[in-house]
């Protein structure tokens, strides 16, 4: 018998901007439990973004994240021996999680010297609708569009 879903954990807002989305981002950025280092990297990256763009670094970061959030994704479903990719709408929580993970994944693959610079330049690129994280979202949407014929299947 199922016991129901676990309680949602509440996140504390970050110390500088008082924003829980920043905390989520930093928690994904963190490696090996080194949260202070993750905060330092994030705040430095936001400062670099602010210097390069001349706008508020946090606002540019939020715009970049919203450009990376996917609205549809594909899930595999087996139908009569064939595996179909069925497009489904992404839940809001998962949308945020995917966007954050994609942005960090692509920032880590960039060629700049420090993580602060990599993250900053990925944020700037994503805020302008460019960059690999935005391309990943576009690829996901393209995949969902090309498999639209299977959207009537239930997952």
From Swiss-Prot:
GO cellular component, one term: small ribosomal subunit
Cross-referenced SUPFAM superfamilies: Ribosomal protein S7 (SSF47973)
GO MF, one annotated term: structural constituent of ribosome
GO process terms (BP): translation
Keyword tRNA-binding belongs to the record: yes
InterPro entries, A to Z: Ribosomal_uS7, Ribosomal_uS7_bac/org-type, Ribosomal_uS7_CS, Ribosomal_uS7_dom, Ribosomal_uS7_dom_sf
Disulphide bonds in the chain: none
Role this protein plays: One of the primary rRNA binding proteins, it binds directly to 16S rRNA where it nucleates assembly of the head domain of the 30S subunit. Is located at the subunit interface close to the decoding center, probably blocks exit of the E-site tRNA.
Assembly notes: Part of the 30S ribosomal subunit. Contacts proteins S9 and S11.
Name of this chain's protein: Small ribosomal subunit protein uS7
Record organism: Amoebophilus asiaticus (strain 5a2)
């Amino acid at each position: 018998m199922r016991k129901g879903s676990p309680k949602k954990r509440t996140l504390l807002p970050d110390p500088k901007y008082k924003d829980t989305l920043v905390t989520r981002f930093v928690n994904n950025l963190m490696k090996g439990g080194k949260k202070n280092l993750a905060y330092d990297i994030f705040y430095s990256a936001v400062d670099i973004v602010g210097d390069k763009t001349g706008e508020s670094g946090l606002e540019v970061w939020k715009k970049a994240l919203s450009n990376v959030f996917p609205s549809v994704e594909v899930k595999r479903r087996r139908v009569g021996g064939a595996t179909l990719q069925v497009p489904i709408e992404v839940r809001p929580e998962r949308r945020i999680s995917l966007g954050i993970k994609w942005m960090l994944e692509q920032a880590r693959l960039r060629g700049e010297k420090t993580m602060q610079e990599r993250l900053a330049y990925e944020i700037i690129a994503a805020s302008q609708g460019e960059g690999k994280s935005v391309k990943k979202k576009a690829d996901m949407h393209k995949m969902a569009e090309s498999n639209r014929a299977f959207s009537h299947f239930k997952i």
